[in-house]
Amino acid sequence: MDVLHVHFGFDQTPPEVLREVAALLAGRRIPLVVTVHDLENPHFADSTEHRERLRVLVGAASAVVTLTPGAAREVERLWGRSCVVLPHPHVLPIETIGAAREPRASPVVAIHAKALRANIDPWPVLEALLPQSGTWRLRLDADEQALGAPQSADHVAARLERYRVAGVDVRVHPRFSDDALRQYLSEVDVLVLPYRFGTHSGWVEACYDAGVCAVVPDCGHFAEQQAFPVYRYGRDGLDADSLRRAVTVAVAGDRPAGGLVQSQRREQRQWIRDQMTGIYRQALGTSWDGGVASGYGCRHGERLPD
């Protein structure tokens, strides 16, 4: 192994074990590169332990990467480390990006509750949108695990039935496979992300790839990933008016041309590969002339391209 690059997978690893790993790498002169995807763990209401793990990893890293300038500022504030900012690449297979979408007479506005993990609270969002849903169809999906989630104490099954009676297209199913996710995204036009906290989301990128307009909360840094409508939602509650305005904008908005999106994603993917190669080479102490602050990313503190 020449470089260890950590993205995920350390959620259950005690900080003292991470310190041992960092010391082992340092002893063998193997650089550690860390990409900070989540400053808050979306699966737990309290991210104290997650932050402690990040503190160990970020402190030991030869290079730190994150996905948005706002997250980079947080990393610098918390741990005094500057980050290379590289955007999240495409999520859907590149050959499927930009596929033609059939216009619907009645657009579908969707909410996905997933397994009702800690940062997801779809109920206030649904309650706010139900009175407005006459001009479009409202769909709610949930993974089967949601029925056994801690939030199920709030009578999830009864809630779902009430929404069905109110006209919501409610679907409970196994967690999506890759193919099922692509099919789902082809069936919806707008996807509201019901996150009360968090940092970044692959769903934002999947929506962009599929030509779906995401509506994202103003918590975390979801709004920096793509130019999607934003509403106010966080640990302190929901601004229902801002949600309804954002959904109205999303339903009426134009989508970028599919061919243009695929071309941009191909170019971005190659650029990110080049940047990561440069980061690895710099971590290893070898020369590299690729530069870091052009195109899609920059070192924190330098101006991002318009």
Language-model segment annotations:
Residues 1-60:
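Extended catalytic core of nucleotide-activated donor transferases of GT-like folds
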Residues 59-97:
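Donor nucleotide-sugar binding/catalytic pocket of nucleotide-sugar-dependent glycosyltransferases
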